[in-house]
């Protein structure tokens, strides 16, 4: 009979770093509210959560690396919104942010969760920041909790 290993959705005693981009802050702040709600709702303590604000999404990966190096975080949650405009800038930023976040997680073994919206329109971003499509900040925090617990089980 196989043994199944999975993380529990319990943030009690876990420490989290949250990085949120100030660019498109009206979206980022809704994502942050969702993430904080999820962490506290699942047993997290406000005193175990550090929120770091960065200018834009491009600064998120290096900041995540700095947080992980600082230590004592069970997971880092990355939040922001990159919205397509009329130039290729979106493609460069979205690609590098997603690659950078994945790299930090793989290089450090600490869950660094991608909660950065990459949308074609502002309407799509609004839908994913607490309206029709739920709150992706909440979802990212749930992923962080479960993954942090899973990694503790795998030690």
UniProtKB/Swiss-Prot annotation:
InterPro entries, per database record: LS, LS/RS, LS/RS_sf
Keywords on record: Riboflavin biosynthesis, Transferase
Entry EC no(s): 2.5.1.78
Transmembrane feature ranges: none
Binding site for 5-amino-6-(D-ribitylamino)uracil: 23, 57-59, 81-83, 114
CDD domains: Lumazine_synthase-I
GO MF annotation, one: 6,7-dimethyl-8-ribityllumazine synthase activity
GO biological process, one term: riboflavin biosynthetic process
Pathway: Cofactor biosynthesis; riboflavin biosynthesis; riboflavin from 2-hydroxy-3-oxobutyl phosphate and 5-amino-6-(D-ribitylamino)uracil: step 1/2
Top enzyme category: transferase
Pfam families: DMRL_synthase
Keyword field contains Transferase: yes
GO cellular component: cytoplasm; cytosol; riboflavin synthase complex
Binding site for (2S)-2-hydroxy-3-oxobutyl phosphate: 86-87, 128
Similarity comment: Belongs to the DMRL synthase family.
PANTHER family membership: 6,7-DIMETHYL-8-RIBITYLLUMAZINE SYNTHASE, 6,7-DIMETHYL-8-RIBITYLLUMAZINE SYNTHASE DMRL SYNTHASE LUMAZINE SYNTHASE
Protein name: 6,7-dimethyl-8-ribityllumazine synthase
């Amino acid at each position: 009979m196989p043994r199944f290993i999975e993380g529990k959705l319990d943030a009690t005693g876990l420490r989290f770093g949250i990085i949120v981009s100030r660019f498109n802050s009206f979206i980022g702040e809704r994502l942050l509210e969702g993430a904080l709600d999820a962490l506290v709702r699942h047993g997290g303590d406000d005193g175990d959560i550090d929120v770091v604000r960065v200018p834009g999404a491009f600064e998120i990966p290096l900041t995540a690396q700095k947080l992980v190096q600082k230590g004592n975080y069970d997971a880092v949650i990355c939040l922001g919104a990159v919205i397509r405009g009329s130039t290729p800038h979106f493609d460069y930023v979205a690609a590098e942010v997603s690659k950078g976040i994945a790299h930090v997680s793989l290089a450090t073994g600490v869950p660094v969760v991608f909660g950065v919206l990459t949308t074609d329109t502002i309407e799509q971003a609004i839908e994913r920041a607490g309206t029709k499509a739920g709150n992706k900040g909440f979802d990212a925090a749930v992923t962080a909790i479960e993954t942090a617990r899973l990694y503790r089980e795998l030690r």
